[in-house]
Amino acid sequence: MIYAAEEVRARFARRGLSFDPTVEEIVRGILEAVREEGDEALDRFSRDLDGYPVEEVPKRAWREAYEDLDEDLRDALETARERIEAFYREEARGGFLRAEGGGVLAQLVRPLERVGVYVPGGSAPLLSTLLMTVVPAKVAGVREVIVASPPKVHPGVLAAAWVAGADRLFAMGGAQAIAALAYGTGRVPRVDKIVGPGNRYVVAAKRLVYGTVGIDGLAGPTETMIIADGSASPRLLAADLLAQAEHGPDSEPWLLSPDRALLERVEAELSRQLQDLPRAEVARQALEKGGLVLTKDLEEAFALANLYAPEHLSLALSDPLPWLEKVQNAGGVFLGEGSPEALGDYIAGPSHVMPTSGTARFQGGLAVRDFLKVIPVVGLSEGAARELAKKGALLARAEGLEGHARSLDLRR
């Protein structure tokens, strides 16, 4: 179905994360039990919900899984890791030390000590998710990266853990895994931050443990938005929309264009390609969540995209680079038909863990900075302190904090 821009504008404007109170109540009980009872509760929930007790998978099993992989798949994993490392190595530089009036002002950049990475289970092994979370953490210098993935852990996930350089891996999933990482148990160490996507129980658990540990964000269903002009290929556009639609029935694939003829050709192409797509029924449901939108021009298309704040924004334009300055809100941007979002999912370089549900308005994708903390350092000389103390005391008294002011008066 082709929508007019006005039909979707209000829907785009009110986007945001929503939470099921019933799910949160269930998750709250799991978190409390694991915090109070530790491994006993962790194993109980794991048996009840996943059918197996929690176990740590030894590194020899990772290596064996890696060695058992098809040679081409091993090479693809290695290439993906190398590209992710190269992309984030540039960001890892930081901090400064500056002389200041006989003293120093500095900014220390320090990696987190221990990070938990959640890798979902399910019908498809998410090898790429493990690479996209563990590798940036290791580039940042995180000392220990602990992976949690539901039992039985797929051999491909174990192989990816070996390639990415993870430190430990526990076969545990769901809210109970988040609880174990957040609070620590006898077997599972407490981490400083938890990253990675998951189902609604995992998302609810991350939301509830925030403050006890850090989190990367709260992920909803995946979404992609393509802005296209008449130069774009309907066949490629349809394929790119279906690549995201097959993720799940709640995915949202959108195509925005001022070219009605293009939208009509894409609509026909979607019907054709759906005929032999293995996950066609899932993709059909997702296409109903999204749609094709006719805009008056490209300017309106970009205004709608910024309102929607998509996880993925693809610019299928004859000359996409000049339009990049119009992008304000997006998790990641893919320029031209030669840079499909599916490449970003696996091997382009940036992490595919990106903000969803409109949170790209205030949050970026997972990166090295998510595994770093900044510590300011102030070391003023006696002369500089004396010079600043009078003005500092004035500010303190304006706030009604006499103790602060007196501390500064003694330096004058």
UniProtKB/Swiss-Prot annotation:
Residues reported in the UniProt entry to bind substrate: 222, 244, 247, 312, 345, 399, 404
Keywords associated with the record: Amino-acid biosynthesis, Histidine biosynthesis, Metal-binding, NAD, Oxidoreductase, Zinc
Residues reported in the UniProt entry to bind Zn(2+): 244, 247, 345, 404
Keyword Metal-binding among UniProt keywords: yes
Family annotation (InterPro entries): Ald_DH/histidinol_DH, Histidinol_DH_CS, Histidinol_DH_monofunct, Hstdl_DH
Cofactor note (record): Binds 1 zinc ion per subunit.
EC number: 1.1.1.23
Domain of life: Bacteria
Coiled-coil ranges per UniProt: none
Pathway assigned to this chain's UniProt record: Amino-acid biosynthesis; L-histidine biosynthesis; L-histidine from 5-phospho-alpha-D-ribose 1-diphosphate: step 9/9
An example Gene Ontology biological process: L-histidine biosynthetic process
Residues where NAD(+) binds: 118, 176, 199
Co-factor(s): Zn(2+)
PANTHER family documented for this protein: HISTIDINE BIOSYNTHESIS TRIFUNCTIONAL PROTEIN, HISTIDINOL DEHYDROGENASE HDH
Primary role: Catalyzes the sequential NAD-dependent oxidations of L-histidinol to L-histidinaldehyde and then to L-histidine.
Cross-referenced NCBIfam families: hisD
Name assigned to this protein: Histidinol dehydrogenase
Originating species: Thermus thermophilus (strain ATCC BAA-163 / DSM 7039 / HB27)
Lineage per the UniProt record: Bacteria, Thermotogati, Deinococcota, Deinococci, Thermales
